[in-house]
Amino acid sequence: MKRRMKVGLFAGGIALAALAAQAADQAAALDGTSAEMWGPGGAKTGQARGAWLKDSRFAMFVHWGLYSELGGRWDGRTQYGISEWIMRRAQIPAAAYEKVADRFNPTNFNAAEWVQLAKDTGMRHIMITAKHHEGFAMFGSAASPFNIVDATPFKRDPMKELAQACRDQGLRFGFYYSQTQDWHERDAVGNDWDFKPGTGDFQRYLRTKAVPQIRELLSNYGPIAGVWFDTPGPITPEQSKGLVDLVHSLQPQALVNSRIGNGLGDYETLGDQEIPRLPRAGLWETPDTANDTWAYAWYDRAWKSPTEIAERLVRVVSRGGTYMLNVGPDGTGRIPEQSACILREVGRWVHAHEEAIHGADPTPFGPLAWGECTARGNTLYLHVFQWPADGKLVLTGLRSKVRRARLEGDKVKTSREGHVLVIRVPDVRPDTLIPVVTLELEGPVDASREASVLNGCRNSLEMGVAALKGCEVKAVNWMEKFGDWKHMECLAGWQGDERSATWSFATVEPGSFYLDVEYSCPAEDDYSEWGVRCGDTALTFPLIDTGERPTRKAFGGALPRFRTYRVGVVDFPKPGAQRLTFGPAGRDATAIRVSALRLVPVK
């Protein structure tokens, strides 16, 4: 009875007259508005069911469907951009798209090999597209014949094979399910080329297809890690809650991500490829992809390097999140070999440093110029991206005493110079993706979050730690090409008589630094005057039009252009506490967005 009451929302039906009228507008917005694509964020605790996610800091995401058979090409033409959206991008009629299933026969699919690759890469759970926006189920479904078992010559259920392979190899397994968009169905959101907008009944879609299929996924594949929802769009709070309750009633330990919509879910999924600049509270993840698209595309060989993937993984973990990296198998069921080779190289590094990744805590420090830090109990792991040429790795802000220091397992010496810990490392960088210095402390971590500027590094002043007057930190999201999301945290909204951002930090020794400003400027603020004050240094300079592209809704509302301008030299004649203030010199320049200030040593 309790279970029936929880899911009864969908049995009884809810009046959705307003939803039908909104469907066309919402479908268009889902092409490029991040709020509609991903829903509201916010810290989530996950309660007891989310405890395992901290111990699974690295995961595999898989986009696989009928779009994989097309590989980004339709009717002799390549549709550039994320290829899993090809049905909508090419406006393929649902009847024509159904025929793709007639030739979809992924005989190279081997569940054990996929899971072994994830395991070799150091990943601990897998999420896969059970149904993406195209509406095709990659599992056997009684709710719709448009599924891989009934509609293709393959006739197998790869989700059952993957679920079993994950159990055999000790990985958790979960499903992606597109709850709002389904381009195969009149009653769902997204297909406005086959179906007249405003004629569908979204509640009927939920009742007849989405809920029955989600119930199948929760009932037929054993214990699952969770259901990964996406693009909530116009789904109502009651509908979102109904789906959450459905998942938790059938599998109480399964997680629901925040893209269920309306502020619900057990953990937060950030924007595609979004890595926060500073630590973030709660349970969260960053979904990223190994190349540019998510599903297989015949032309996309823009693979991220092993070092880039490892650094992105470390950045996410050091901020307190889980990094979920996507692969896109092709229409035959094979993960591209070049991608697999890159993942295995990443895995060799992860397996050598598992204690610094899985189950690790975020950094206790402020921004570190040379890299990132993760922690576990009384141990710190320093991930060094910029290797010190003088053999001295400098760490400021650590008050705890160091018992032992090791670099890739070998002992290294440390010394104190005032408030600074100096770690003596070889002049030659170790041959590994990211060298890791392990500091075993004599007691609990006692550290300051004060930022530092180091002479041997390219230093960034993070927007989130500045003291602000008459401006604010705003997230800027856009797509360079369709589906290729970019994210920046910018100083923006310059208003009032006093407008400035001030950073406090420490320098370890005297030095001179170039100041680079990365910004975007619309035409109306061209040649606006700006200034920097830092000790005895005062700089005045113009910021000029960066040539932003006019607004296009299909590209996230705008296509901003950022440029970097070297505005002058800042001198620090003495080490110690410093303050740098940046802001407009006049009353104009209200629309300029500043994404980074960098201090680069003068050499």
List each model region and its residues:
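Sec/Tat signal peptide C-region and signal peptidase I cleavage site
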Residues: 19-23
